[in-house]
């Protein structure tokens, strides 16, 4: 990492240079917007400036060029500093950024919790008798496959709507207020679930609650990636997966308690719904005091607020902190400016498919997240129901679910350690490979009806959960934040998550048909199907998923711009701040050529 004292000294030298001509009135210092207008008017991208030994005092126009040069140099220094920053230094420098990111991501606990209890309700006796029907052949009570599919479709449809509403809401009021509004609506919609007396009311409640969940899915990832440096990006984006698991673990514990103590009481399903009121208010208060994303503020031209936001994420004080703030703001400006020059329009959903570069980035982001569904993870969400249909007792099914989520949490922590030695693609691909093997073994055990094979298939589903949370589950949250451009990040993540939701709907329907005794009744033999689909996802990853570990946002932008193939991303080195073979330009305000600038035509 560049020595910070070097950056401070260079800044001090620049400050002293501004006082060389004490008799001259202080000239107007151009803002970034003015500098950007100047370069656009000339159709130039200033890269390098040279002053001859006998140069006169710079004019205002030439100071514009000098300021642009300094901003680009600052951006380069900040980018190099971020790329080489050790984890310990990042934690010491950005502890508040990490804390704010953890707070925002905690909203996902509620989604993981509620989606898990919905699947567990299907195995809860009181819920089965209250809302289900009796199987004439087996005499067992269960929720019909059509209603299970309907309830799943409702909350996923709500998430799709919520995600689409998140885009314009963020453009209008920012990340913080969008999250606060979503938390308010979630608390209100939970009343419908608590007072439900029919599956229809549950369907309405799930659909309405799905809208704020969709908001959480998008903004937790984008906020974490924008507020934290590269060294912390993997840990804080993948923390989203931990929040999902914490929510699912809480749900499994609550449902086991309901199955044990309230098996014949309406509290068995009302109490789990009521517990959703615990988090919205404290989270909303915390997020109200959180800093807004500096990337969002810079895109809105609110540079002073972006600096204040960055100051609130950094530790320390004095000149070192101010220089870090200035360098980071300059880097964000340069990155966004380079993206804006590709199009004059404000970022929209259509821009995600506008050209070959953005189409590729959008495709990879969408398929990357869809891989979480096609790898068989939806089966993990219905684990309690799966265990029961595989022949495991109801009480043991809930116990298996708790063990499964604990293994998932351990696996996610292990992925943090593994990320230091393996890349994003490595974890994604290796996780898929292991899951494929285990699914085929589960399918084979499903062909036997012995007690040992039933317990074996249940145990191996826990192995699937472990490898899933070691590989594809956490790394996806990091990858989807790195693939899009900063200008289109929120909208691309929304499209990707909605792709996941649509694919999840299809996978959920298939799983419910595979497990329901009135439909296909495959049981553990469904492992064969998910093994094949998981293998297909692995093939896509090998062909199309690039390695972004150790790459800053501006480097990733350049690699996509150059059309580097997926498997060469890791080995290709780029310098986004250098333009080669540039023609010469002499300023109109300096006809003698005292100031020479190397430029590149747009």
From Swiss-Prot:
Expression triggers: By maltose and maltotriose. Repressed by glucose.
Residues in the signal sequence: none
GO CC, one annotated term: plasma membrane
Topology term for the membrane: Multi-pass membrane protein
Domain of life: Eukaryota
Predominant place of localization: membrane
TM stretches of this protein: 107-127, 143-163, 179-199, 201-221, 235-255, 271-291, 364-384, 398-418, 427-447, 460-480, 493-513, 526-546
Keywords: Cell membrane, Maltose metabolism, Membrane, Sugar transport, Transmembrane, Transmembrane helix, Transport
Any one GO molecular function term: carbohydrate:proton symporter activity
Pfam families: Sugar_tr (PF00083)
Keyword Oxidoreductase set for record: no
Cytoplasmic side: 1-106, 164-178, 222-234, 292-363, 419-426, 481-492, 547-602
Extracellular side: 128-142, 200, 256-270, 385-397, 448-459, 514-525
Cell location: Cell membrane
NCBIfam families: SP (TIGR00879)
Function: High-affinity uptake of maltose and maltotriose. Also transports alpha-methylglucoside, glucose and turanose but not melezitose or trehalose.
Protein family (similarity comment): Belongs to the major facilitator superfamily. Sugar transporter (TC 2.A.1.1) family.
Official protein name in the record: Alpha-glucosides permease MPH3
Organism per entry: Saccharomyces cerevisiae (strain YJM789) (Baker's yeast)
Gene name, Swiss-Prot/TrEMBL: MPH3
